[in-house]
Amino acid sequence: MRKHVLQMEKQLKATKKMLLKDCVLKNDIDFNYDFILPFSNAERIKDVKLIFIGQDPTVRNRKSREKIKTTLNLDKENSLKKYLKTVYDIMQVDIEKEIYATNLYKCFFNKPPADDQTILTRQFKIWMDLLINELSVLKNTFVVTLGEPLINQLIHTNSKKVKDYWDYTGKTKSGKNFKCNEPYENYLQRRIYPIAHQPTWNRNKFYKTYLNDYLEYIKQNERKSSKA
C-alpha cells in the first residue's frame, strides 16, 4: 500500500503542474497548500475491505487549511472520526488495517464549491479520471460515500438523493427496503452506499435513527455479494 500512496503523490504533483498551466482551472484552486493524499494504514492493497470517499477538503478559514494533512482528517480525533467509527464497528472493519479513504477533489478551492457549483463542473473530468485510475488497484472493493453533493457527481443513473437509498417514506421514517447504487449506475463501476456527511447526520433525525440499520444492510449485502 505504501508504494501505491507514493505513486499517488507523484500523480498529484503531475496534476498540480498541469492545472497550473491551465489558464481557467488554476483560478479555482488554492495552490498555497499541498494536495491531500489518500489515507490507508493497510499493509497490502488486497487487505482493504472498504473505500471511503469524500468530496473535497473544504475549509472556509484559509489559515486552518495548513492543519489538514490527511483525507477526512483521519489522523485526528474529532467528530467526523467518531462518526466513521460507528461505520467501522458495525461493519467489523479495522480502521488501522482494512480501509482506504480518499476525496474526489484532493485540492483546496479558493471558494467552497457550495458557494459556486460551476467550480465542480469545470474541475470534474480531470479529478474523476484521476480517481478512477487511483481506485483501479483496489479490486472488487465497495464504496461508502459521504454527503449528497458527492453522489450527484459519481452517479449517472438512478437517484442522487441519499434518503432514497435509505428508503425514506416521509416523516423521518424508513421502510427499511435499503439499496445501493449498482456498478453500472456510476462512474466508478462499483457498489456505492451513500451515507450522510457527519454534520447532516448530526442534525437530522431520519439519518440518526436509521444509520445503524443501513450499515447492517451494507454488511449483509456485501456478504451475499462475496458468496455470489
Predicted features, each with a name:
Residues 1-31, 111-129, 156-228:
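C-terminal capping/extension of enzyme domains
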Residues 27-98, 162-169:
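Adenosine ribonucleotide-centric catalytic and binding domains
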Residues 39, 55-56, 104, 145-150, ...:
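Short, well-ordered beta-to-alpha junction loops that form the rim of enzyme active sites
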Residues 59-60, 108, 150-153:
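Short, active-site-adjacent cap segments at secondary-structure transitions
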Residues 64-65, 155-157:
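Short amphipathic alpha-helical segments
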Residues 80-114, 189-192:
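Conserved catalytic-core helix/loop/strand module for nucleotide-ribose chemistry
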Residues 92-94, 135-138, 184-188:
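Short, conserved loop/helix-junction motifs that constitute active-site signature segments
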Residues 96-149:
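Internal catalytic-core helix/loop-beta-alpha segment
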